[in-house]
Amino acid sequence: VRIYTIVVVIFTLAFSLLSGFILPRDVGPVMPLILIAALVVIGSVIATFSGILEGWMHEFMSREFRRAGYTMPPIYSRVVTLGFISTVMLSFSLLVLLYVTLFTPGAPTALVRLLLALSLITLIAGLLTLSIVALLSPKLISSFRATGALVELPFLLAILRVFSKTHLTLYDMFKLVESSQALRWWAEEVKHRESIARERGVSLLTAISFMAEDHPSLEVRDVIKRITLAGSYAGSPAGVVERVSTQYFELLRSRLERLTGYMYIALGIVITSLFLIPVLAVTIGPALRIPPSSIVLVSIATAAPVFLVTYTLIQSMYPTGFMLNPPGALKTFYTLSVLVILGLIVASLYLIYTGKPFNPLIAYSIVLASLAPAVALAQAYMARVSAYERFLRVIVDSTELAAVTGENLVSLMRRVAGGDRRVRKLIDDVERAVIDDRVRVRIVREAPNMLYASMMETLIYALRIGAPLQVFSEIATVYEHLKETLRRHQSTMRGVELTLAAVIAAVSLFSAVMIRVLSGIAAGIKTPTGAAAPGILQQFIIAQDPLMIYAVLTSMMVAGVVTGALVEKAKTGTIATSARVTLIYLVLSITGVLGLVAFQLLGR
């Protein structure tokens, strides 16, 4: 109640100060004081009944959260109650100002209407917003919870499968998950189940088994039900976890295979729709007398929906745990380079529309220079990702050698790594993380994706508990299987990347050849009387029309940038590392026509 009273006092003081600036000077002090006193009385009544209001809000929202399978945060009902009181007080304050204005001689009619509209809009919008928050927030939280649990479910199964080979019980395994930095959603879920266990006076495993009934995800319900039943009746869930994880890993593989199949179709549509525009511009555009600016506008209008639809398709099908998470510096430089490219496209469209000439060699040199830092950072980042791949192979080889020689696993890992500095640094970090939890947090945070974050954390946990060699062999087997699934997909997408590069180069060369051939044919045609060729033939002398050439170059650039971003998104799950592919496609797409322009400039 004290908090609500403070809110009422703050609104009253704010209204008193604002009324001194808003009200006309000829209004006496009596009327505002009376209305302020009325506002204080209204606020006091609201603050007095705020406890009852909060209790009703708590009961209503708790029921909605329970329906969504989640426990409402304790402060949630208080925040909603504060929002309700603030909305009502603000609306009443505006009504008080409206009342004073009505009794003020010569008050502007517009001010009266404005205060009335603001008061009604504030009250309606505030109550509507609070109602939506109270009704939809449990469903939104439930949706986020289901999505997060599904994203991390393969790696939860990997951890449970690895540690089911040890002496740890299912309770101990979930306690490890509770402290996990790689599986944040499941760590929060276990903490939440632990609070439920304390409230209901049951064990942690019993509280976790409740997920089989109230979790919003059907897949999570099925997995938890099978694991907890096996842990309760069989003592060890090893067999069930292995079967479930194998099924789920195969599901991931099939998802990536479907994505690869869809990408053949989607990228075929992308390259056909985007690169067909410049081809048509140089072949039938002159006959139809299409303005150069229209070519650029059509390219942009086609590229925007094609990019959004294809990007959404990839985002929905690509497993989130396999997506790379580049550092902020790489994202920043890539964003800046994209902004430079967009700026060049807009500038080109403006200059083409106004008919002003510009040098495309200088313009595209600026674009290539803007991509250079992003390319360098992307290459450095991908080299770091490759170090994690080599580290996984080192684990595989070291466990096989340790089974024969019986040597210490970490020492064998250093020997197998040899002179690979990046891998040796990862080994040193893992060894330090065994005794220093801050190093473990840093290793997980710096991992390129959830796959490697989970692998590193599982390896650290296994070293901490002194797990037998069989556990490390299981780590190598599980994560090598996951990595092989991802590697096959990325290998296929590299083939798609090279195929598209060849197609783009062919389209660029074809456009340049058609410009040269059609221009030469049109320029060489003479009428029998020696008069100038017809106007339609003059339109085909594209080589002498700089605006048409600039329009074709801009259209090719739009197609190259969009295709490069989508190919990289399908390969790694992010477009932030696409600077290299974008640069290659950009160079290939404009080389033919740009070479023709350079040849003509040198010829002059």
Residue ranges and their predicted role:
Residues 1, 157-272:
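Membrane-anchoring hydrophobic segments
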Residues 1-70, 375-383, 596-604:
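Membrane-cytosol interface segments
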Residues 4-16, 81-100, 123-133, 252-314, ...:
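Bilayer-spanning, highly hydrophobic alpha-helical transmembrane segments
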Residues 4-5, 21-38, 107-125, 292-302, ...:
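Hydrophobic alpha-helical transmembrane segments
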Residues 33-52, 209-236, 440-468:
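Short, non-transmembrane cytosolic segments of multipass membrane proteins
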Residues 49-73, 102-106, 137-141, 238-242, ...:
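Cytoplasmic membrane-interface regions of multi-pass membrane proteins
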Residues 59-71, 112-212, 333-445, 454-457, ...:
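Juxtamembrane/interface alpha-helical elements of multi-pass membrane proteins
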